[in-house]
């Protein structure tokens, strides 16, 4: 006789009310746009190439590494699509990554399988950017398995766009599952979805924003 799978324990009212989420204490423009997010689950950043998507992701990563003097999160950026390159180097320089050198790691085209091994180690990153959805070789099933396997970590996926929507079935599935979704267009990051109370936008580069929108007009 095969062993029957037992359901997970149902949570009581007391269990729910006593839950203590591990929140990221965003401040300023980050709190206004996103709210007070938890260190868990997934986010999605999406947009066309050349619109400021990578620059915004780097700005967010740097902020997570230096929220205040006493609080920061180890962050890794898995550049599966591009890897170490001159454009990544320039993004580092623009963002001032030298100031958070010990807290921010670039993973050079690291596979999801190798990433899982890394995340099982002690003192592994708290936040992981995966760039991009289209090159990660994930399915909906393996995406969920990855996020659920490391329930105390935050995964931020980066995706190409098809118009103003994430490109492809997996990216669209992540959009519906993610706690925060951000569409980057014309060097403005628009928060299209947040389960943490935030709403609004963050300008990635004021000079490039003005240049882009002046041409559009």
Predicted feature locations:
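Active-site-adjacent loop/helix micro-motif of nuclease/hydrolase catalytic cores
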Residues: 52-56, 136-143, 166-167
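Phosphate-binding/switch region of NTP-binding enzymes
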Residues: 148-217
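Pre-Walker A adenine-sensing motif
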Residues: 21-37
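Conserved P-loop
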Residues: 39-113
């Amino acid at each position: 006789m095969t062993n029957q799978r037992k359901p997970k324990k149902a949570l009581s009212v007391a269990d729910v009310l006593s839950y203590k989420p591990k929140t990221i204490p965003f401040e300023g423009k980050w709190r206004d746009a996103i709210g007070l997010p938890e260190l868990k689950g997934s986010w999605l950043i999406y947009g066309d190439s050349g619109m400021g998507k990578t620059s915004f992701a780097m700005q967010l990563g740097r902020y997570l590494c230096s929220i205040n003097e006493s609080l920061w999160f180890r962050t890794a950026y898995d550049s599966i699509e591009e890897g170490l390159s001159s454009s990544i180097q320039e993004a580092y320089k623009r963002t001032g990554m030298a100031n958070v050198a010990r807290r921010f790691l670039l993973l050079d085209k690291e596979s999801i399988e190798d990433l899982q091994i890394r995340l099982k180690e002690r003192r592994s990153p708290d936040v992981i950017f995966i760039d991009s959805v289209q090159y990660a070789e994930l399915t909906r099933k393996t995406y969920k398995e990855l996020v659920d396997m490391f329930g105390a970590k935050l995964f931020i996926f980066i995706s190409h766009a098809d118009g103003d929507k994430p490109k492809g079935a997996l990216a669209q599935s992540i959009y519906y599952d993610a706690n925060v979704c951000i569409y980057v267009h014309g060097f403005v990051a628009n928060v299209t979805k947040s389960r943490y109370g935030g709403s609004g936008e963050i300008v990635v580069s004021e000079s490039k924003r003005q240049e882009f929108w002046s041409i559009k007009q």
